């Protein structure tokens, strides 16, 4: 339970400068940078345009439109955190218009910068850097795609914005081998070995973090060298981190890793990505590789011989979320990143795992007898991966490969853990529904699923597809190391049925540890990492199997005090100041049942007297770029 006499309903004290809206600023940040390039092709007859001397030719294609007519409306309604459906459609219509009528990527970029500033999408410096970073890849993607503006926005913003089905009617082939009868795992015998697995995710190291700078600057990421000083009446960024739109200095990550002793010892480590900071408008490949090598070296230094098994996050690439499928070759491919990962992680991974990592950023290995670990590249399911506009049908053949791995494990009698970054309930519909189907088919083999990305502490329950009523698996979504946005730093430890013959390898319990930033940033204080809570003890769970998590959701529907405890822990002991009333509570609980995207039927029993689309619309999925 929470320490220091702080009740779950109150949370830890917030600084006076923090605004209630701060937490929301990070949610759509990828789309905003996406948007910077989309604007590039608008207003082709504007008097502010100029033609660079060195113009690279563009292919022509498109649906002509008059984007200029909606520009005044956009200027009035559009903000840094507000991408509406009409705006999205206008922007992609403008893309087609520009590609048809203009002749250079450089021209496209010049218009994008001017419109980004005009419509106040971002500060001028961010507009300039973002457009220059995204323009080449985005123009390449759009000229190779076959989507209309409505379909593109349906892909990015969901089915309520557009009908997107060009690539959605695909299915993974399952083997003809009959599915064995469901066999829920049995509790281990008393005294059976228990393994402790350290889970790290979303570290987000900011090389330019600087104590004393403005934590509420105008840029998407603050507490940095270029953030400037805070207003005279406000304190600056804390030494160890800040409750704002800020990432972590290296010293806080060093403190985390050096202070793991009380939570250990660990048998292995699952590390699910997002190493670089959120300054996505100004990142180079060199920056990303520096983050990869620096943090990998830090993990090796403090964890020594403990085996570490990483997964690829959406922030590892630049532009952010840009993960081309393997059919994209040359300089625009992800070869530069996967090769660097293979080199950095070679001490932890066998040759076959390194081979598939180099191809598509995913791999499988056997960390111990009877257990198979599969690390997925969840960027191939992401709405924010703009390369999927070209073709989103099972990118890199990863899901079909997953089926092969699971069938082989079933044949051997092995159990399987899956790790990844983006949770399956946040994926493109076709990918998510296929993954859901795979999980149901191999429910006896699949012993655990572990993801990150959302920065908060939650889970996703899977059900049988026929009735959507029998819980059969659960994906654990662990909280982030970073404070972004307005959170305490944290990490997770899983207790797993241990290494012995006949082990189920299922999760028995989990623990969450945090650093209380309020205390750590006090003058003369030293950072302290402490146990925030244990899941079974805090929630009164009989075990950590899927049915227990299903039951917890429905208990929280009726027990508001229990939900307030969950809400407090969901935010790592630092919840927003605004209360979470009934609509917020139902939407949050619906998210815990939604391991399959665009599937409101999963919440039908949770809100029998309400409109399911209305309730689901209240759940703002944390699309942290």
UniProtKB/Swiss-Prot annotation:
Q: What is its main location?
A: other
Mention any one GO cellular component term assigned to this protein in its UniProt record.
membrane raft
User: Native species of this protein?
Assistant: Bos taurus
Signal sequence, renumbered to the chain? 1-40
Note describing how the cofactor binds: Binds 2 Zn(2+) ions per subunit.
Enzyme Commission code(s) on record = 3.1.4.12, 3.1.4.3
Q: Name one GO molecular function term.
A: sphingomyelin phosphodiesterase activity
Q: Which SUPFAM superfamilies match?
A: Metallo-dependent phosphatases (SSF56300), Saposin (SSF47862)
Encoding gene, per UniProt annotation: SMPD1
Q: How does its record describe regulation of its activity?
A: Hydrolysis of liposomal sphingomyelin is stimulated by incorporation of diacylglycerol (DAG), ceramide and free fatty acids into the liposomal membranes. Phosphatidylcholine hydrolysis is inhibited by incorporation of cholesterol, ceramide, DAG, monoacylglycerol and fatty acids.
Any extra detail in the entry? There are two types of sphingomyelinases: ASM (acid), and NSM (neutral).
So which domain of life are we looking at?
Eukaryota
| Sites bearing Phosphoserine, chain numbering | 504
What name is this protein filed under? Sphingomyelin phosphodiesterase
Q: Which reaction does it catalyse?
A: a sphingomyelin + H2O = phosphocholine + an N-acylsphing-4-enine + H(+); N-(octadecanoyl)-sphing-4-enine-1-phosphocholine + H2O = N-octadecanoylsphing-4-enine + phosphocholine + H(+); a 1,2-diacyl-sn-glycero-3-phosphocholine + H2O = phosphocholine + a 1,2-diacyl-sn-glycerol + H(+); 1,2-dihexadecanoyl-sn-glycero-3-phosphocholine + H2O = 1,2-dihexadecanoyl-sn-glycerol + phosphocholine + H(+)
- Listed as disulfide-bonded, the cysteine pairs are 85-161, 88-153, 116-127, 217-222, 223-246, 381-427, 580-584, 590-603
Which residue ranges does the record assign to the Saposin B-type domain?
Answer: 81-165
Question: How would you summarize the oligomeric state and partners of this protein?
Answer: Monomer. Interacts with SORT1; the interaction is required for SMPD1 targeting to lysosomes.
Q: Would I find Phosphoprotein among this entry's keywords?
A: yes
Where exactly is the site Cleavage? 247-248
Q: Which GO terms describe its biological process?
A: cellular response to calcium ion; cellular response to UV; ceramide biosynthetic process; cholesterol metabolic process; negative regulation of MAPK cascade; plasma membrane repair; positive regulation of apoptotic process; positive regulation of endocytosis
Processing and modification events after translation = Proteolytically processed. Mature lysosomal form arises from C-terminal proteolytic processing of pro-sphingomyelin phosphodiesterase. Both lysosomal and secreted forms are glycosylated but they show a differential pattern of glycosylation.
């Amino acid at each position: 339970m929470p320490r220091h006499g702080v009740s779950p309903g109150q949370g830890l004290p917030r600084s006076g400068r923090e605004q209630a809206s701060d937490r929301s600023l990070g949610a759509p940040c990828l789309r905003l940078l996406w948007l910077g390039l989309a604007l590039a092709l608008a207003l082709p007859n504007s008097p502010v345009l100029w033609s660079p001397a060195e113009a690279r030719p563009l292919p022509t294609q498109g649906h002509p439109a008059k984007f200029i007519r909606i520009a005044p409306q956009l200027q009035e309604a559009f903000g840094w955190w507000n991408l509406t459906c009409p705006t999205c459609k206008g922007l992609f219509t403008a893309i087609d218009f520009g590609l048809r009528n203009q002749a250079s990527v450089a021209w496209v970029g010049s218009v994008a910068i001017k419109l980004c500033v005009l419509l106040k999408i971002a500060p001028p410096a961010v507009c300039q850097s973002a457009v220059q970073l995204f323009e080449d890849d985005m123009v390449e993607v759009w000229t190779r795609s076959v989507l209309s503006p409505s379909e593109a926005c349906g892909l990015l913003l969901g089915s309520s914005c557009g009908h997107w089905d060009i690539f959605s009617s695909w299915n993974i082939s399952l083997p003809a081998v009959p599915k064995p009868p469901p066999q829920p795992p049995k509790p281990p015998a008393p005294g059976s070995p228990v393994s402790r697995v350290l889970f790290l995710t979303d570290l987000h190291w900011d090389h330019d973090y600087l104590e004393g700078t403005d934590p509420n600057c105008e840029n998407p990421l603050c507490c940095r060298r270029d953030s400037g000083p805070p207003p005279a009446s406000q304190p600056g960024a804390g030494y160890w981190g800040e409750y704002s739109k800020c990432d972590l200095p290296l010293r806080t990550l060093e403190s985390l890793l050096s202070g793991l002793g009380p939570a250990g010892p660990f048998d292995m480590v699952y590390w699910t990505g997002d190493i670089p900071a959120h300054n996505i408008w100004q990142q180079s490949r060199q920056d990303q590789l520096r983050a990869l090598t620096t943090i990998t070296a830090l993990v090796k230094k403090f964890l020594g011989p403990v085996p570490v098994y990483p997964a690829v996050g959406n922030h590892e690439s630049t532009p952010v979320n840009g993960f081309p499928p393997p059919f994209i070759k040359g300089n625009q491919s992800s070869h530069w990143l996967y090769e660097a990962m293979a080199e950095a992680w070679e001490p932890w991974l066998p040759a076959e795992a390194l081979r598939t990592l180099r191809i598509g950023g995913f791999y499988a290995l056997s960390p111990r007898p009877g257990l198979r670990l599969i690390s997925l590249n969840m960027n191939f399911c992401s709405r924010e991966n703009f390369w999927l506009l070209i073709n989103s049908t099972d990118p890199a053949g990863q899901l079909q490969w997953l089926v092969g791995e699971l069938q082989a494990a079933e044949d051997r009698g092995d159990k399987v853990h899956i790790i990844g970054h983006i949770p399956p309930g946040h994926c493109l519909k076709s990918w998510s529904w296929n993954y859901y189907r795979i999980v149901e088919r191999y429910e006896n083999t699949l012993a655990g699923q572990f993801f990150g990305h959302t920065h908060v502490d939650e889970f996703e329950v899977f059900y049988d597809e026929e009735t959507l009523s029998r819980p059969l698996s659960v994906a654990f979504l662990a909280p982030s190391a970073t404070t972004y946005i307005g959170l305490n730093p944290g990490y997770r430890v899983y207790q797993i049925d241990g290494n012995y013959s006949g082990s189920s390898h299922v999760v028995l319990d989990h623990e969450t540890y945090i650093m209380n930033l309020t205390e750590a940033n006090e003058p003369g204080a030293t950072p302290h990492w402490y146990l925030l809570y244990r899941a079974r003890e805090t929630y009164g769970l009989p075990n950590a199997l899927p049915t227990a998590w299903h039951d917890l959701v429905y208990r929280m529907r009726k027990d508001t005090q229990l939900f307030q405890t969950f809400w407090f822990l969901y935010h790592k002991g630092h919840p927003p100041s605004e209360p979470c009333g009934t609509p917020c509570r139902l939407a949050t609980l619906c998210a815990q049942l939604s391991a399959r995207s665009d599937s409101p039927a999963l919440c039908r029993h949770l809100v029998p007297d309400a409109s399911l689309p209305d309730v689901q619309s209240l759940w703002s999925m944390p699309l942290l770029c």
